[in-house]
Design a protein with these regions (language model features):
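Helix-to-loop junction immediately C-terminal to a conserved catalytic motif
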Residues: 25
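Conserved beta-strand-loop-alpha-helix hinge in the C-terminal portion
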Residues: 205-227
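Catalytic Walker B motif of ABC-type/P-loop ATPase nucleotide-binding domains
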Residues: 145-149
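Conserved catalytic motifs of ABC-family nucleotide-binding domains
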Residues: 141
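Hydrophobic anchor residue at the start of the ABC signature
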Residues: 134
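Conserved ABC ATPase signature
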Residues: 115, 120-124, 128
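ABC ATPase NBD coupling module
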Residues: 41-59, 88-91
């Protein structure tokens, strides 16, 4: 992939999109082949280097017992000694950094200033929780973002806004989310025009890899109707 590239990962349910993303971020081992990041295998990569690959899971994995700020702050754990990091997470939330990440994730500024950081995560709506998960990812400062259906079950307006915060680029071509590249799995093929490149899977096999602006309705029909 290239710097600034936005990749959509498409395929029917069961096509192994989530599995591919889990292998790419190192949380699942592949039976064959190798995943390399910046020229090095992620299997032998130091933990801190691997943290350059950030994952936005479909299940969010927010900790209900922690506040919004503590959940967001947990994104920075990989950059510190584990014991120091856990203590910092629980007792010394970086309010300024967390507010900045929440704003970049699209949370309302007035809501943030009214004490959202100290609110229990369980009080938030589904859309707000999705944005908190994105803010936690931004707190990690990843160079590569992998997102597993981040807009599933969201209202269309909220989904579109969340994609804006992930995909929009500066006039110089840099992703505003701070990453060098991003891969997002989708169940909404009508959104591929927002990406640069489309990868299609069928039953775990790569069957499509082409520029998004060259994708045709017939290509999508073959991808989703086969099998």
């Amino acid at each position: 992939m290239f710097e600034g590239e936005r990749i959509a990962l498409l395929g029917r349910s069961g096509s192994c999109k989530s599995t591919l993303l889990a292998i790419a971020n190192g949380s699942l081992r592949s039976e064959q082949g190798e995943v390399r990041w910046c020229g090095a295998s992620i299997r032998s990569m130091p933990r801190r280097k691997r943290r350059e690959i950030g994952m936005l899971w479909q299940d969010l994995l927010l900790v209900e017992e922690l506040s919004v700020g503590q959940n967001v702050n947990s994104g920075a754990l990989g950059r510190h000694n584990l014991i120091w990091g856990l203590a910092n997470l629980l007792f010394n939330v970086d309010q300024s950094a967390c507010k900045h990440c929440l704003q970049r994730a699209g949370l309302d500024a007035d809501l943030i200033e009214r004490g959202l950081i100290d609110a229990p995560i369980r009080q938030l709506s589904g859309g707000q929780r999705q944005r908190v998960a994105l803010a936690r990812l931004l707190r990690q400062q990843p160079q590569l973002i992998l997102a597993d259906e981040p807009i599933a079950n969201l209202d269309p307006a909220i989904a579109s806004d969340l994609l804006d915060h992930l995909l929009n680029r500066s006039p110089e071509g840099q992703l505003n989310c701070g990453a060098k590249a991003i891969v997002i799995s989708l169940h909404q093929p009508e959104l591929v025009h927002r990406f640069d490149r489309v990868i299609g899977l069928q039953e775990g096999e790569l069957v499509m890899d082409q520029p998004a602006d060259q994708l045709t309705p017939a290509d999508l029909s073959r991808l989703y109707e086969a099998g």
